[in-house]
């Protein structure tokens, strides 16, 4: 009997199923697969053969009715992924947070847990609103409720009553003591204050009307008037405690008169006529004349209340009235000799005697005197019209150019060329036409 033909089923690549008959019973799997790959036009080396999920060797015989599958070969990687899996497994075992994991439906556990918490919060929303309203009502009731203050302390109340009684008694005693002191003070004043005689009133009126020619002592007249008025209103007891007040004003007047007379005796004094007229008044008091201008210095340095009684008495008793004119002439003669030696003019000496307001005008007068001082020192004024250029002015020298610039009130610093150019630029110009930037700045006083 003829042998039956062997038929094998081959699947692949893909989902292609095909029955391949074998020419002989001893046909191998390699022959069948080779013929199938030729028909499908795919390389044999890219597949391996499995039968019922088991890898089949290429030299085995073909079984009748068996299904052979062609599985594509996969290229292998570098490796090392296993170590990563082991590290991830160890980390998963150590942590307790499973929110990054997924459930069987593929959702993350974090999202699932958030949904559950949100549902619980929405359910409790009504309860929270009710609790909030309850707290608001309780707070409002506490504010509206009246304070239940119940403080009962008999000791405290007793102390309050005692303090009020003591305070009332103390106030009454103080008022009684004050009224008794006021009454006693009025009685003593009426006893100690006698009636003033008409002679005393006339004397005080004369003192009030008497005025002296003061030099820079305008404030002393006001002080004298206030002291005289206050002395009339004060009691005799107070006047006995300070007996030197009237004598101080007397000495101050006498010192001022003597100083005015000394200034009047000097030549060129601007106040000689006024002081001489005042010195001939019949109300002049005679006091000793010390050094010239000493009375003025003492009066300007001290107030009338600072002069002691002893100094006033010594001034009254040291010299006689007859010696005063002789000493005045001697001192005026000595002052004239000193002026001649020191070169001080009469106007300068009179400026020393002037008050603070008069002294302000003295520097301006001295400045005008300095403008003509070059002629007195033997230096003639430079005629700028005789020079045709600044280079010719340089022949005068630094010091001479400085002097000329100072006379004009201009800046005197700089080099020889700068000074000559500055002086030449103002040639033939009046003071109003000169550039203000060329004038020297006024010197500032020293800060104390």
UniProtKB/Swiss-Prot annotation:
* Coiled-coil parts of chain: 109-149
For this UniProt entry, what is the primary localization, expressed as one broad class?
Answer: nucleus
Which residues are annotated with the PTM Phosphothreonine?
Answer: 277, 324
Instruction: Cite a single GO BP annotation.
Output: cellular response to UV
Against InterPro entries, the record matches this protein to:
RNA_Proc_DNA_Dmg_Regulator, SDE2-like_dom, SDE2/SF3A3_SAP, Sde2_Ubi
Q: Name one GO cellular component term.
A: cytosol
**Keyword Cytoplasm, does the record have it?**
yes
- Residue ranges listed under propeptide: 1-77
Q: How is it modified after translation?
A: Upon binding to PCNA, the N-terminal UBL (ubiquitin-like) propeptide is cleaved at Gly-77 by an unidentified deubiquitinating enzyme; the resulting mature SDE2 is degraded by the DCX(DTL) complex in a cell cycle- and DNA damage dependent manner.
Q: Where is the composition biased (Polar residues)?
A: 270-279
Name by which UniProt lists this protein:
Splicing regulator SDE2
User: Region annotation Disordered: residue ranges?
Assistant: 175-252, 264-372
Assembly and interaction partners: Interacts (via PIP-box) with PCNA; the interaction is direct and prevents ultraviolet light induced monoubiquitination of PCNA. Interacts with FBL/fibrillarin. Interacts with CACTIN. Interacts with SF3B1. Interacts with U2AF1.
Residue spans with biased composition (Basic and acidic residues)? 188-205, 307-341
Modified-residue entries (Phosphoserine), positions: 269, 281, 332
Q: Which residue ranges does the UniProt annotation give for the motif PIP-box?
A: 39-52
Q: Which UniProt keywords apply?
A: Cell cycle, Cell division, Coiled coil, Cytoplasm, DNA replication, DNA-binding, Mitosis, mRNA processing, mRNA splicing, Nucleus, Phosphoprotein, Ribosome biogenesis, RNA-binding, Ubl conjugation
Q: Where is the SAP domain?
A: 393-427
What species is given as this protein's source?
A: Mus musculus
